[in-house]
Amino acid sequence: MSKVLVLYYSSYGHVETLANAVAEGVRGVAGTQVDLYRVAELVPDEVAAKSGYKEDTTAAVLDDPSVLAEYDAIVVGTPTRFGNMASQMRNFWDKTGGLWAQGKLIGKLGGAFTSTASQHGGQETTLTSIHTTLLHHGMAVVGVPYSCPALTELDEVSGGTPYGATTIAGGDGSRQPSENELTIARFQGQHIAEMAAKLAG
């Protein structure tokens, strides 16, 4: 049995919705276990409350980076912060030096997904900022191939790239992930789970 981790950070719930869709896609692959965790919030509680951060999440916080070594594939989700991963996710990965030194993640699969306010708000640079970290750990990056028809959907403004699933939240965050974007996220989860199963033999 292969094990897939979906690890995310979400301020307002957009990335969390994508994370659940990715996990749903993973669950559709027989013989695969999927775990869904989030990283810790760094913003003080009072600031998060005033900013309207989503607080009703059910995913547990993953505090111990050493747990990553137990998985065959890790899919990482974070909203963009100026074209890069959010500091909460960066903080988590900055604690993985021990894993890197021991080569614990070499040969494992990795993927990424994100949200931005606008269509051109840094989706692909955020995804590649995640990819860079995964590659430094010796992981093999798996994206979303164009065998996913939703990538070329033209009937709506939609997120979704070959680098990973994405969503567009709007300037005020009011837009939630569309069905097309969720389809891409589910496809991504299924695809990386199938790849992990093949490698696990």
From Swiss-Prot:
UniProt catalytic activity: a quinone + NADH + H(+) = a quinol + NAD(+); a quinone + NADPH + H(+) = a quinol + NADP(+)
InterPro entries attached to this UniProt entry: Flavodoxin/NO_synth (IPR008254), Flavoprotein-like_sf (IPR029039), Flavoprotein_WrbA-like (IPR010089), FMN_Rdtase-like_dom (IPR005025), NQO (IPR037513)
Residues annotated for FMN binding in this entry: 10-15, 80-82, 115-121, 136
Any one GO molecular function term: FMN binding
All residue ranges annotated as the Flavodoxin-like domain in the record: 4-192
List of residues binding NAD(+): 12
Alphabetic keyword roster: Flavoprotein, FMN, NAD, NADP, Nucleotide-binding, Oxidoreductase
Classification via Pfam families: FMN_red (PF03358)
Co-factor note (free text): Binds 1 FMN per monomer.
EC number: 1.6.5.2
S-S bonds: none
Signal peptide: none
Highest taxon above the source species: Bacteria
GO cellular component, one term: membrane
Co-factor requirement: FMN
Sites where the protein binds substrate: 100
Family: Belongs to the WrbA family.
Protein's name in the database: NAD(P)H dehydrogenase (quinone)
